[in-house]
Amino acid sequence: MSSGGRGGKRRGAPPPGPSGAAAKRAHPGGTPQPPPPAATAAAPVAEEEDMMDEDVFLDETILAEDEEALLLLDRDEALASRLSRWRRPALPADLASGCSRNVAFQQLEIDYVIGESHKVLLPNSSGPAAILRIFGVTREGHSVCCQVHGFEPYFYISCPMGMGPDDISRFHQTLEGRMKDSNRNSNVPRFVKRIELVQKQTIMHYQPQQSQPFLKIVVALPTMVASCRGILERGITIEGLGSKSFLTYESNILFALRFMIDCNIVGGNWIEVPAGKYMKAARIMSYCQLELDCLYSDLVSHAAEGEHSKMAPFRILSFDIECAGRKGHFPEPTHDPVIQIANLVTLQGEGQPFVRNVMTLKSCSPIVGVDVMSFDTERDVLLAWRDFIREVDPDIIIGYNICKFDLPYLIERAEVLKIVEFPILGRIRNSRVRVRDTTFSSRQYGMRESKDVAVEGRVQFDLLQAMQRDYKLSSYSLNSVSAHFLGEQKEDVHHSIISDLQNGNSETRRRLAVYCLKDAYLPQRLLDKLMYIYNYVEMARVTGVPISFLLSRGQSIKVLSQLLRKAKQKNLVIPNIKGQASGQDTFEGATVLEARAGFYEKPIATLDFASLYPSIMMAYNLCYCTLVPPEDARKLNLPPESVNKTPSGETFVKPDVQKGILPEILEELLAARKRAKADLKEAKDPFERAVLDGRQLALKISANSVYGFTGATVGQLPCLEISSSVTSYGRQMIEHTKKLVEDKFTTLGGYEHNAEVIYGDTDSVMVQFGVSTVEDAMKLGREAADYISGTFIKPIKLEFEKIYFPYLLISKKRYAGLYWTNPEKFDKMDTKGIETVRRDNCLLVKNLVTECLHKILVDRDVPGAVQYVKNTISDLLMNRVDLSLLVITKGLTKTGEDYAVKAAHVELAERMRKRDAATAPTVGDRVPYVIIKAAKGAKAYERSEDPIYVLDNNIPIDPQYYLENQISKPLLRIFEPILKNASRELLHGSHTRAVSISTPSNSGIMKFAKKQLTCLGCKAVISGSNQTLCFHCKGREAELYCKTVGNVSELEMLFGRLWTQCQECQGSLHQDVLCTSRDCPIFYRRRKAQKDMAEARVQLQRWDF
Amino acid sequence: MERKQAEYSNLDERYAIQGEKYQGQQYSHIYFTRLHHMRNLLHALVPSWKPHLPVTTVLGLEEGKDCIIVGTLYKHMKLKPSILDEYSKERSAIPLVKPHNFMHPDDHLILEDESGRVTLAGAIPPAAYVTGVVIALHGKETSAGNFLVEDILEAGIPPQITLPSINEDKYVVFVSGLSIGSEKFNPLQFQLLIDHITGHLGDENEQSIASNIVRVVVAGNSVHISPRFFNGQAVASKDQSRIAEPIKELDIMLTQLVASLPVDMMPGSNDPANFSLPQQPLHRCLFAGAATYNTFSSCSNPHQFELDSVRFIGTSGQNIDDLYKYSDAKDKLEFVERTLRWRHLAPTAPNSLGCYPYTDKDPFLVESCPHVYFVGNQDKYETQLLQGLEKQKVRLICIPRFCDSGVAVMLNLRNLECSTLSFSTSFDA
């Protein structure tokens, strides 16, 4: 994210939209800003998180009140009363009128605006000031907007030696002058409000003295932190001290986060404003039911415990839109109308949505249990949706791909239609929502382009983004995601059909509406199923960042937030060190012991280090503030007994000298996790359990991400001394464990066998003790874990967790085995690194690998597995494999010209467009293809073909391609440790000699061929049109008929099962199945069954003479 | 002695799919036709059932208002096997369900018409109904959007042509589940049956009874062909001829029968016929010997015919077996009775029972009540004379599998009374 570069660009451009007052989200006062600090402008994407303040909303974007009144004129009365049914419960009388009771609410969003400072609450200030806004919901379900006054932006610099109070005021004046120069057009009376001398200590490196003087610089507006920092970093001349450039501290923290840290507020916690400490807003700015003004010092922030760990009844809106695209194009807002919007609103904690409605363009037949609202113009549809949002007032907006598609589409469409009053979707009156392009880049999640639609006061939660973050799946289509998590196939209507349905009658539009509703419901169900609300709120509470950060930002902000909180307690300040993006400072990673590949038929015990990296950091007190750099080591002359030298050569002081902050954070996280897990065992209430489980998960993830934070070279506070020490300790421990195990568990030591370490990964070691029962191996495993743990510094602990038996070790990071935690029965089959779910594999590979592993590990039947492979290969060569198993799918992300290398799916899309532009895949679609037989020497990308086309025209597939490029590698990987000559045995045996290739029905040569009937028994050509068998086969008539009819019978069974399944997914018996979901495993089978059926019946009819 | 004759007319025409083709049609049409036909019937019955209530569609429901809706039932079943299970991620070692019944306490019914669906609650037991039945319901919509059922109207037993009066004993013999080619088949047992029917066995009295047998109906599963011949793998040439062995054996035995009296041959689920209902007649080329007699007739399943104006209808059992998988009743006869009351031989087709995708008709609708309704391949012999509200009388028969029980069923056309012919080849029985 880089707002610096972006902000600069936008400022010059006229605001889009017809009205000059279109929402413009920029810097305060709309004044031209100085160029953003060089650091951010020069490297727009390099930083994972740019700490520039962005959550600023302008007064200017707010429309004049008379304008507002105009907008609300001539709204449909009937619609208004329809929508008003879904309003929030009315405020109780005392809250509605007075200020006589405490207001407690769970906050979800915190941002700020620049406004005049509050005259009553802050009688001594004037001019523009930052006003924080906290949006939340009370226990009774009332929405609250709390405006917090008096919190000022600040940062630190270290005080130059010998600076006295007079020097400070001179320094103040100089700085003020420089600020004025670079912010000429600003109407702020004073830029630097004050400079205070404080006693603090830097977090960087061990410092023997407790504190030293720092200057706390308080500025007028949050954005001035950056410009002031720029001035100080570049250097400033101070009278008497000369020119000096400063290192700034805590100068890159988002203002809202700064506020949360200072007020002890964590994401998603409960906040209480005591009676008498707040006042009702004089001028209502938001659509919230309750709008308060108060001072930041009067807020009471509750820790998430007991009553305050519960969730408020948030309103969650799940929605989906349908657009009528033109044939052959993906819908574009400039051309294609929005025709339907389906909405479901659910109260947090309830199983069923309480609002179900769909807004349609043109009439639509009613749907049971759904409010259908039809409109004649698109304008009315869009405005009705806006009104709906305003009435229902959702706290959280969810959907599938809403951030990149639905929301931007609606807004851009409204712009095209010149509906200026549409995008008022946030909670602030008359503040328009605008679309911006953003890129998000992070080491963990990769670079991602996205659109950012800020809806003030409402949290957006795009399930697609969440899925992409949290799960590795082969496909992220809503269909395959719901198949994966909900076990359901989703009906998929191709976008070329959508327009036809829309242009039909009210019945066909109803059909579309039902589909649209289903798409709106699935995200809600995913949200429930995966406990996303609980997990994300808990993550926000544990790490202390707002919920919206969790989806839009990377890992490091979470660690930074914890670090800042802890540092504040310890009176430490964090320097603003920009990471060097250079990759020179790499360090040696984790160790992996040599894997002794093989198939182990004796139990393998696995010894795991529990939370290895966090434990190392705790055990050896590794932290920023305990690190002693080599130059200091000489100076300080620390006695050797009070420091640890790490294997990578760094020096850290021991905890009795100075306790590290990171170890302390980790201790707290792990202790909290232990507590959460214990509470989880006790808890009965399912909601409470959900919260606790979410919490323990969040704690675990947070603990593990601390190490990564120190190693992120482009992060906020990289410290490679720490991360390389951690990994070096890790390596040492793995080696140490191996040595101890192999020394102790020997026949000489009185054990039955010599133990052997066959493999070791980052934090685990696999040992073969040589015993043959799971029970014995468990006993020895436990003994070894206890013995070795005793040799480590606490809290590093080696645990015995599981046995693999049998165990197939292929190479490092690739293995499979049966997983045992009790001696009676294995728990599951565990595999790692064996591609069963890779995207560019066809289903055949997945099935084959899974089945083989099952046969080898569970059935212990290696010959059976070999036979299975042979049969499958033979089926493949004999053209007996179901085509859907051979389909390979790839996403088309850009058009053909943009791809540097020719790719199979791109070429195919191009060819399909020439055949029929209407149904050809467009950018954004997934392209399924199979590899067909073609002329010798044809490139693989030329041999891709549409599976449907292949089915319809009997085109032969290329079994050799599948054999060599798809199945051989994964198979050999599995079988090589087991079989000698695996390749010869499996891939070149006698079973590969019989080959059958179908004859294409559309190839050139067939045009010259004459069709003749052949005997069904022996394929001899027979003369006479009404015969089935040749003379010789006549005697086998009964037998051959049985085979023909048996074939028909099988196909009929398949046909029935496939088509009734589709009816079931579709949820209707009386309507034709429309679904064309190519992600569905039975789509091609269904099509093939239909075709085969027709052919088989023709064959059968030949007997009827 | 001379064998008695009865006038026979075959009514299987409606089950023929000779001219039909698979042209991409789907199953929605058959439901549509069924609903259309049954709704007309039910609407006609409503005035005499609850004349004061309005009849509406699922869409027209208003919360809290009493009304009648007519539609097709859909039963949502948790345990219903799905073809998608083949693709599920985890394979479980033990099958979770007993294979014979997919019922679960969470099952619920949904009523569907062209306008929409509504979930049913109240006085309608999910266990007694299956997907595909068309009924009328009295009830009202609840605030949760469900339909609270108060009363159910089924179409009931259809009208019947009057039973002709026949003054003499004439018997029809039903046999099913011979399973020639399976281990259970006992050739001697079947030979005894043949000899008994053809009059080669027993004393004069028995022979005179045998001479009153006017027809034999073989209700499915006459042969058993090992499934390994059809799993797509190549069959060794020496095995190829073995496929047809059971059929040849059947042909030889059938030939003895057809030489002395007419035989109706119905296909069943294990026979070399198509899978979907209606199953088409077994091909004559399978019966090189028997087919040369004009007394041999190969029929469809379901099979419908008249003997001396007594109306018969019957199946080889798939329709009832499927009801048994997806619903619950005290005995098999109750399932049989239900199909009559629902006026549909196979309501679960096409949902869980294979069926041809008709576009313009639903051949399984029962428009006129038969006098005899038989179902082949059941576990045990059961029978009942069902009386309808309009004095309809139907003889319901469950024919046991002959290979298990050695029992054939004999029906007297004169009084629709039923008895069994039991054959055993062991002495202690």
Curated annotation (Swiss-Prot), chain A:
State the span of motif (CysB motif): 1062-1080
Quaternary organization: Heterodimer with subunits of 125 kDa and 50 kDa. The 125 kDa subunit contains the polymerase active site and most likely the active site for the 3'-5' exonuclease activity.
For molecular function, the Gene Ontology terms on record are:
3'-5'-DNA exonuclease activity; 4 iron, 4 sulfur cluster binding; DNA binding; DNA-directed DNA polymerase activity; nucleotide binding; zinc ion binding
Indicate what this protein is called per its UniProt record.
Answer: DNA polymerase delta catalytic subunit
The record's Gene Ontology cellular component field reads: delta DNA polymerase complex
What are the residue ranges of zinc fingers typed CysA-type?
1015-1033
Tell me the domain comment.
The CysB motif binds 1 4Fe-4S cluster and is required for the formation of polymerase complexes.
Q: Which organism is it from?
A: Oryza sativa subsp. japonica (Rice)
Spans annotated as Disordered: 1-46
**UniProt keyword annotations, A-Z:** 4Fe-4S, DNA replication, DNA-binding, DNA-directed DNA polymerase, Exonuclease, Hydrolase, Iron, Iron-sulfur, Metal-binding, Nuclease, Nucleotidyltransferase, Nucleus, Transferase, Zinc, Zinc-finger
Q: What does this protein do?
A: This polymerase possesses two enzymatic activities: DNA synthesis (polymerase) and an exonucleolytic activity that degrades single-stranded DNA in the 3'- to 5'-direction.
Curated annotation (Swiss-Prot), chain B:
State a single Pfam family of this protein.
Answer: DNA_pol_D_N
Main localization of the protein described in the UniProt heading: nucleus
What is the enzyme's main class?
transferase
Signal sequence segment: none
> Key word Metal-binding present in the record?
no
Q: Can you state which reaction this protein catalyses? A: DNA(n) + a 2'-deoxyribonucleoside 5'-triphosphate = DNA(n+1) + diphosphate
EC number(s) per UniProt? 2.7.7.7
Which family would the database say this protein is a member of?
Answer: Belongs to the DNA polymerase delta/II small subunit family.
The record ties this protein, via PANTHER family, to: DNA POLYMERASE DELTA SUBUNIT 2
As for what it does, the entry says: The function of the small subunit is not yet clear.
Q: How does it assemble?
A: Heterodimer with subunits of 125 kDa and 50 kDa.
This protein is called what? DNA polymerase delta small subunit
Q: What is the lineage of its organism?
A: Eukaryota, Viridiplantae, Streptophyta, Embryophyta, Tracheophyta
